[in-house]
Every structure is written in structure tokens, then in C-alpha cells.
Amino acid sequence: MAQSVPPGDIQTQPGTKIVFNAPYDDKHTYHIKVINSSARRIGYGIKTTNMKRLGVDPPCGVLDPKEAVLLAVSCDAFAFGQEDTNNDRITVEWTNTPDGAAKQFRREWFQGDGMVRRKNLPIEYNP
């Protein structure tokens, strides 16, 4: 069963953080790429620390080995300097899909006792 093998690595482009630049009086969209660099099919889900300000599309999916997906990370307009942005980040969570599973995302893959890996991408706001 796939769950007994720890999920392999993913790569993100950018690799360490996401940067949004002022002005913040309109919605910004930034694209990141997630690449499944492992030899197994994975399911991924994206979480944000501030759901009012940050959105990700598509928020989840399935990637075959070596497959990549482009995600649109959006930042809604907000009053820069008047809201706490220190802890804003996006977290990519991924896990191996069960053997024989269809290539369709299932939330329950993350709720069992299988291993889930995480990668945090802090968000930096340039004034």
C-alpha cells in the first residue's frame, strides 16, 4: 500500500517564499509551480493562514511522478500597515495516493494514518 512509503519530495518555484509588491489597493495574483519530483503519484492540498486575504487556485489536486501544476496565488486588496501580515504563509501538504486510486483528489487521503508532508512558503509584502 502506498501509505506505508513516506511521500517523496516536491519542488516549488519559487522555492522559499512568495513576494507581493505594493500598492495593495487592488487584487494581486502571483503564480507558483509545484512539481512532483518523486516516483509516486501524490495528492496535494494548499492551505493559507489568512483566508480573507489569500486564495489559491486550484486549492488541491493530484500529480503523477514528475508532473507539475501552476497555481494562482491571489492577494486581495487590504490596508497595508494596518493589518498584521507577519505570519502570512501558504502551506503545501502532500501525500502518496493509494495504489489503484483514480486520478481524482480525495480529502480523506489526508485524514487517515498515512504520512503527510508539508512545505511552508512565507509571504513577504514589499511596501
UniProtKB/Swiss-Prot annotation:
Protein name: Major sperm protein 19/31/40/45/50/51/53/59/61/65/81/113/142
Keywords, ordered alphabetically: Acetylation, Cell projection, Cytoplasm, Cytoskeleton
Modified residues (N-acetylalanine): A2
Record-linked Gene3D superfamilies: Immunoglobulins
GO cellular component terms attached to this protein's record: cytoplasm; cytoskeleton; pseudopodium
Signal peptide: none
Function: Central component in molecular interactions underlying sperm crawling. Forms an extensive filament system that extends from sperm villipoda, along the leading edge of the pseudopod.
Short name of one Pfam family: Motile_Sperm
Source domain of life: Eukaryota
Major localization class: other
Organism: Caenorhabditis elegans
Localization of this protein: Cell projection, Pseudopodium; Cytoplasm, Cytoskeleton
Classification via InterPro entries: Ig-like_fold (IPR013783), MSP_dom (IPR000535), Nematode_MSP (IPR051155), PapD-like_sf (IPR008962)
Remaining remarks: Around 30 MSP isoforms may exist in C.elegans.
Residue ranges annotated for the MSP domain, each copy included: 9-126
Quaternary state and interactors: Helical subfilaments are built from MSP dimers; filaments are formed from two subfilaments coiling round one another; and filaments themselves supercoil to produce bundles.
Tissue/organ expression: Sperm.
